[in-house]
């Protein structure tokens, strides 16, 4: 396992230096590496280019934006945008980070070993990307992990949660999904979990009632 971990770290360093530093003539290779490691440590979390540039001691947020663009170009890290009808607002808002491989993110990042929910979320993101969906996240009064858009229509709203047995967790996930579905009337609602399967009916208003499907992630992965 240690040899495999060392191999992955060498592989990442090789990609960073060969495919990014050399190709794009990056002067501060350490800042690029720290950006990649920061992203790996925070998969499924929001990032502000301005705040990260300050954390890394860089002069401006544009540099961090370029770093992430390079990381996406070599398929190491990915960003998704908060959905908004205004493209200008989409570009200005914070993004959410995901990685190309969960094992790689575990090894080069600094994540708590019990934070399995984020890695499940990363698995779902990668599958959505493999299926070539246009992916966003929702943030209104509550948040929803993924929105899928087809043309101009949001077709699916998806939450990812390792377990739904805790009442507070269940309420939070359902509330976030309900908030998303209230914004996008054409969307279907799903919650992907480790092992639960159920159907929940929610009243969004006096006129609208929606059905939410709770599905084990493994079953969803095999569904197409």
Task: Cite the ranges covered by each PLM segment.
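Structural motif
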Residues: 155-156, 188
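Accessory nucleic acid-recognition modules appended to NTPase machines
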Residues: 2-155, 162
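Flexible, glycine-rich phosphate/dinucleotide-binding loops
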Residues: 86, 106, 166, 198-199, ...
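Residues at the C-termini of beta-strands that transition into short coil/loop
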Residues: 101, 139, 161, 193, ...
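Generic recognition of well-ordered alpha-helical segments
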Residues: 103, 107, 176-179, 217-220
């Amino acid at each position: 396992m240690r040899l495999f971990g060392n191999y992955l770290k060498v592989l990442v360093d090789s990609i960073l230096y060969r495919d990014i530093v050399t190709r794009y003539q990056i002067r501060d290779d350490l800042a690029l590496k720290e950006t990649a490691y920061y992203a790996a440590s925070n998969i499924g979390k929001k990032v502000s280019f301005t705040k990260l540039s300050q954390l890394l001691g860089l002069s401006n947020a544009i540099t961090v934006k370029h770093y992430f663009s390079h990381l996406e170009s070599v398929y190491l890290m990915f960003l998704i945008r908060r959905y908004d009808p205004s493209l200008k607002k989409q570009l200005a808002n914070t993004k959410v980070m995901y990685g190309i491989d969960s094992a790689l993110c575990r090894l080069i990042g600094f994540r708590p070993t019990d934070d399995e929910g984020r890695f499940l979320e990363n698995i779902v993101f990668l599958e959505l990307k493999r299926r070539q969906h246009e992916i966003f996240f929702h943030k209104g009064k509550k948040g929803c992990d993924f929105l899928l858009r087809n043309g101009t229509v949001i077709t699916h709203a998806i939450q990812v949660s390792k377990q739904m047995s805790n009442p507070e967790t269940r309420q939070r996930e359902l509330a976030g999904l309900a908030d998303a579905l209230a914004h996008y009337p054409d969307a279907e609602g799903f919650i992907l979990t480790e092992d639960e399967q159920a159907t929940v009916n929610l009243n969004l208003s006096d006129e609208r009632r929606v059905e939410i499907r709770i599905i084990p992630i493994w079953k969803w992965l095999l569904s197409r």
